Amino acid sequence: MEPQRRELLAQCQQSLAQAMTEVEAVLGLLEAAGALSPGERRQLDEEAGGAKAELLLKLLLAKERDHFQDLRAALEKTQPHLLPILYLNGVVGPPQPAEGAGSTYSVLSTMPSDSESSSSLSSVGTTGKAPSPPPLLTDQQVNEKVENLSIQLRLMTRERNELRKRLAFATHGTAFDKRPYHRLNPDYERLKIQCVRAMSDLQSLQNQHTNALKRCEEVAKETDFYHTLHSRLLSDQTRLKDDVDMLRRENGQLLRERNLLQQSWEDMKRLHEEDQKEIGDLRAQQQQVLKHNGSSEILNKLYDTAMDKLEVVKKDYDALRKRYSEKVAIHNADLSRLEQLGEENQRLLKQTEMLTQQRDTAIQLQHQCALSLRRFEAIHHELNKATAQNKDLQWEMELLQSELTELRTTQVKTAKESEKYREERDAVYSEYKLIMSERDQVISELDKLQTEVELAESKLKSSTSEKKAANEEMEALRQIKDTVTMDAGRANKEVEILRKQCKALCQELKEALQEADVAKCRRDWAFQERDKIVAERDSIRTLCDNLRRERDRAVSELAEALRSLDDTRKQKNDVSRELKELKEQMESQLEKEARFRQLMAHSSHDSAIDTDSMEWETEVVEFERETEDIDLKALGFDMAEGVNEPCFPGDCGIFVTKVDKGSIADGRLRVNDWLLRINDVDLINKDKKQAIKALLNGEGAINMVVRRRKSLGGKVVTPLHINLSGQKDSGISLENGVYAAAVLPGSPAAKEGSLAVGDRIVAINGIALDNKSLNECESLLRSCQDSLTLSLLKVFPQSSSWSGQNIFENIKDSDKMLSFRAHGPEVQAHNKRNLIQHNNSTQTDIFYTDRLEDRKEPGPPGGSSSFLHKPFPGGPLQVCPQACPSASERSLSSFRSDASGDRGFGLVDVRGRRPLLPFETEVGPCGVGEASLDKADSEGSNSGGTWPKAMLSSTAVPEKLSVYKKPKQRKSIFDPNTFKRPQTPPKIDYLLPGPGPAHSPQPSKRAGPLTPPKPPRRSDSIKFQHRLETSSESEATLVGSSPSTSPPSALPPDVDPGEPMHASPPRKARVRIASSYYPEGDGDSSHLPAKKSCDEDLTSQKVDELGQKRRRPKSAPSFRPKLAPVVIPAQFLEEQKCVPASGELSPELQEWAPYSPGHSSRHSNPPLYPSRPSVGTVPRSLTPSTTVSSILRNPIYTVRSHRVGPCSSPPAARDAGPQGLHPSVQHQGRLSLDLSHRTCSDYSEMRATHGSNSLPSSARLGSSSNLQFKAERIKIPSTPRYPRSVVGSERGSVSHSECSTPPQSPLNIDTLSSCSQSQTSASTLPRIAVNPASLGERRKDRPYVEEPRHVKVQKGSEPLGISIVSGEKGGIYVSKVTVGSIAHQAGLEYGDQLLEFNGINLRSATEQQARLIIGQQCDTITILAQYNPHVHQLSSHSRSSSHLDPAGTHSTLQGSGTTTPEHPSVIDPLMEQDEGPSTPPAKQSSSRIAGDANKKTLEPRVVFIKKSQLELGVHLCGGNLHGVFVAEVEDDSPAKGPDGLVPGDLILEYGSLDVRNKTVEEVYVEMLKPRDGVRLKVQYRPEEFTKAKGLPGDSFYIRALYDRLADVEQELSFKKDDILYVDDTLPQGTFGSWMAWQLDENAQKIQRGQIPSKYVMDQEFSRRLSMSEVKDDNSATKTLSAAARRSFFRRKHKHKRSGSKDGKDLLALDAFSSDSIPLFEDSVSLAYQRVQKVDCTALRPVLILGPLLDVVKEMLVNEAPGKFCRCPLEVMKASQQAIERGVKDCLFVDYKRRSGHFDVTTVASIKEITEKNRHCLLDIAPHAIERLHHMHIYPIVIFIHYKSAKHIKEQRDPIYLRDKVTQRHSKEQFEAAQKLEQEYSRYFTGVIQGGALSSICTQILAMVNQEQNKVLWIPACPL
């Protein structure tokens, strides 16, 4: 509003408010004009009388907009007589009742004087200024001025007309209306005031009447409620009366029964008295008879008669006594029942009284209602009286008006008044003249204004058009605004992200500032150094001049060298040819020398140890400190503990355990580097902390002296110059590494001839490729114009001799030098400089390029696999009978290797070099497989033993990277001459991963290498962090071997599942029969003691085992071909049965059948300790090797990783089946071995069940974790082969399939079948029956076979998800399990037999009966199931074999994880069948014996231990994640012994306690309990033990119920209600603490540390509880010591403490009070609560509790309709039993009873709303939350908490809560909320403090969003 108008309105505010009468009309017009908002109108309506007008004017003055015109228009329409007050600030009385009424004086008195008139007229628009208008006026001002003038003109015209009338009346003496003017009578004013008062009273009475009507309606409603309540109470009372009558009738009946019983009792008593009398009579008769006749016979007869009668009476008496006792018992029961009924009657009487009281209360309320109705009638009567009085007052007012008319007529008669009128007339004339003059001025001004109005109208039209355009622009701007709003939302999110980034950047800034300070210090030091450098610069300049002259000379020499390049190439080719010839000539001599040295080395093991130092090299590594506060993480490596926790058993050195890729240490340090010194600090016998201290204390650079394995292969950097001659493409394809992937034929690179596929490219045109990506390298190749200079890294295998450089290497070196000289010194120097620039470490013993191989590559050069080994080429391998190699394979290319070859999983090199580290891969396109095919290397390195050597050579290569070999032809194993003892035992060649402790007594035909074994304390890989001892008992079974002439020491020591797989002091090596996979590249794999195998495992390989499972001398170098990683599954060490096919076995042979074949008995050693007295055990023997310990630190690999073992050893091992080492049918012809990996689904199709090559069940299991590689095929020669032949044939074997999940048979089924059937010798083959009762019976995700188990299913409303069928011999079986169903989640499997269902026996039920039983509706289902898949399978799948192993009935489904029998070949993989005639009965029996022994070993067994001490002496590992395993058994333990526990045993039961899902701490506590003897059920499962060993074995989540502040660094601090993830309950064997992770809101791990265990905290609570009891007993007389008050807790809540010192001391003990820790209930832990993680993908329902629920829900739905939706209640007309049954069946959540129906909340409606992506607002009672939890629905429960009922009453909202909450209603809601909070607070997700409704809704929205994004934790089973 303009200031002038605001001032004018403020001046006349009071007078205008007093004069305004029709306020309601004015308000209506103002509201219609938009001057008043609805809220202001409601505010004005609340006011009454004159205050309303005054408030209206105040509101108008307070508004910013100008509503003055609206007020003027409203007054003009309703009360025009008030306009002078508005404009002239005058005081005008009420309007006259008629025109011309009133005296002339009163009219004229209201008119202003001349001065006032002029001033008031001139003040319109401009107050206090001249009347002339301003020169420039706006359109709005002009319009307002025109309107004001027109109003004033109308007023003046009206006044003029009235004055004319008065003037005429004064002149003529009469008025125009014939009525004289009279002054108002004072009584009229008084009556008018009384009338106004009466009208106000009438209005108040109307308001009271309205309120009374409302109250009456409320009372009527309450009356209806109480009527219904009364009727309900009456019905209850009637029912209770009926009950009482019924009870009375029952009481009367009982009384009648009591009377009858009492009467019968009296009859019985009377009969008893009669019987007594009769007995007395009989006695009297007897005495008389005795007196008269003393004959004994008569007496005896009488006596007998009496006794008979007595017996009859006694029986009757007993029957009656029994009946009497029963009646008495019935009577007592009736009495007790009568008493109960009496008590019930009393209770019902009390209830009736209560109901009567309630009825009386209702009657009182009814009386009150009647009184209120009477009161209402009285008020109505009073209202009628007031109306009558009002009519009387109106009649009196009319009389007064008539009297007023008479008074006016008398007034005219007075002469004095006429004189006055004349005088007044003169004054009026003068004023009229003045007004007319002013009117002329106004008219002139109006003319001017008219012209201005026309201009304004034209402007208005233009402004209208502009307004339309502006509206269009506004609409566009509105759209832009919407988009901007959306962008603003996105921007807010981005701002939040940027805020977080800003925080991180701030932190980085702080660190950068700190680093800047450090940099300043360094800068000062740099300035000092710069001065020194400046001084040295001058001297360097002179040196630079000299170097420049030398460079010019070198450039000229380079030009000369390039000119002679062609001649040099020709010379190179000639020298290469000569070199090949020299190689072939020197090989035989070198092999003889090597073999001689090897045999000489056998006499002393010390020689191997002395040469150990030749495998090591010392290197100085330097790091540049970037900052002062550097740590291991910044350097990018980690180290082992050292002395405190040795990385390897017996070796306390500090080793590098991890090197981060891309870090500072990458390329400088390697895994398993031995740190000798750091910054001149000796680290011998130091621990990790001291090493870190030495690392951090250094200033400037960090110098490390490390010791590592030498890389003994020769590596050469060969420069290559390619002349592109205008061609754009060089023809070279690269792959990650950087390696040459392919060379395009005819390209410039192919024409040069020196570049081969697999060569590593170190530099391009002098630019090092060390840190360049593949794209950058390719761009460098493309950027070359005319010429291309490459630096190639070629790796050549070193000779197997340890005696220095031999002739072959000298020739090779000469070849290198030729290559270097051909390319000139400048390129070499340039490449060398580039290499040095990218590697700061200084190596002392090897060439620069050795470090290039250490860099990790992203993948192998030959394929897309990300694993660090190369696939073997796809070409087949053939074995040729030639004894000498051809020259075609002796080229450098056959020895060529690429740098990626040194990055295997820690493989042991074939040539006796150091084991290849994990970040090295084997060099060469063929990897180890190809390199091992070279005679000079593979034969030399793998020689030893007495096996007849196979002289190997190569044939033509049909395709790239394919090698063919054939072994030497040998006699058939069926030749009877082979059973004769040869004079000279043939040599056996072994390729084991470690040096054997025993040696061959005869020299080999070729010289083998003299590679010493590696130190027994080193390991070169961190891929597998478990340690393995190599000795323990063996469960191997070997049946059908030849007469043993070898010592037990010839047996291959394998990873014994009985030993703990963790670091332990080195023990003497113990050997056993096993065929296991040794860790690749494990440092200890090269020196395992005497790993001599008697079998070959066909389950995972038919080729590579040849390179691993051979006996060889202890000093022979170990060989480990690259294999696919498979964790050792000792569970699948399955002993097989092998029986000879004919009766040629001598008794001696049968006697040695269980033992391993070997060499002559003169090499045997005494056994280390006696083995188990059972068939199939192998005697232990002490090997000649020194004490060693095998440390398993690598994954285990199978042949399917595309590495073919060296064929230098007999290839017969490739075909040795797991059942024996006999020649199988499949090996009689040329077969094809498919070594490709297959998926799990493929495995089921590759199950071989044919003849003697049938695999064990564990060998046929598919594994989803196996690696996928390219398929390769290996040709098997037709020559019958066998792994070893010492004296005669060895056909017995043990198969220990050792893969994480048993692999498939690599043999093709079709090929095997056709070949086996086509062989004529098939009938002579022994039948191999596989023992099906292996540990393979239980897969990781499968239950134990034939072991009943309880399965609990929380069914709810969902289907079970299984299909059932009836067995052939009865029983109900699960034929299908739907994946993801609740049955699948609960653990039901295909093949489960359902024994019981909720306690109902189904063992003999039919399928129809079972379906009826299973179809019953219930919340929780308990099923007793037994895993018997074979019982159902045997009846539905036929077998094609003529003979089945009887143990085959125990076979299990060992498929690839399918739960339905979709693959018939998978149904019974353990059933074996014969292709030829069946085995003779004698042979069958022996195989059954072996199978039974095998079954006894691998099935769960029961161990009885007599506990003579507190501890069993058993070390445990694992936990509830994988199971609790026996890690170690102490020597003095009662569990030690042949029938005791062995490491690797999985504890299934301890006593009567099932420990399958127990933590290791719980099992440990159970073992500590005092017992005389204990029964354990265990199962030997080494493969899972290998996984569980060394890793945390427990896994569960807990909620902390107290606060804890860590005192030590290793401990974990947490707060109450924090979620912790416990992964180790017995860390390092320490009881009393747990290792746990602290989790954030998203269940992500934050920090790991140590926390007190549950048992420790329970003891703490018990102690405190006892202390508090002592406090209560002693009250204030005692105070507890400070030690008793110590705890792990920190007080979170403030307790009310008393003022006394004793009270303060005692209250400090209340840390377990109810506000912080729950109370004791059913042995629940007070410290921790076990919880379960639930991922809520759908939106969770919302349940709001507290006062004003409906209003809040309505507001949420209206304000956020896309987020919330109320759950609709379904109206159901059904019986209450049906509704409750629906609740029980989880169909309904809750229901409310209405009149005649039920309002039901269903689960389907909740899910329907959830599926719409909305939160469902539930309307259920709090007790239904538990039902929702059972249905796996977890609502967000929000409680609205108000401080008092007054706050509830004060809540108002203009839209959602218009009516004020009454006092009673608010009090009831508050009390109900308090009760609800007290009873159900444990379910509350959050509590919101009550306030304004909008604030509550905002808080609910925020809380719902927060809780929806949180991870949900629900209570699980108690700890």
UniProtKB/Swiss-Prot annotation:
InterPro entries: CARD (IPR001315), DEATH-like_dom_sf (IPR011029), DLG5_N (IPR006907), DLG5_SH3 (IPR035537), GK/Ca_channel_bsu (IPR008145), Guanylate_kin-like_dom (IPR008144), MAGUK_Signaling_Regulators (IPR053004), P-loop_NTPase (IPR027417). GO terms for molecular function: beta-catenin binding; cytoskeletal protein binding; signaling receptor complex adaptor activity. PROSITE patterns: CARD (PS50209), GUANYLATE_KINASE_2 (PS50052), PDZ (PS50106), SH3 (PS50002). It is found in: Cell junction; Cell membrane; Postsynaptic density; Cytoplasm, Cytoskeleton, Cilium basal body. Signal peptide: none annotated. Residues 109-123, 1252-1264, 1284-1298 have a biased composition (Low complexity). It is linked to Yuksel-Vogel-Bauer syndrome: An autosomal recessive disorder characterized by multisystemic manifestations including cystic kidneys, nephrotic syndrome, hydrocephalus, limb abnormalities, congenital heart disease and craniofacial malformations. This is Disks large homolog 5. It comes from Homo sapiens.
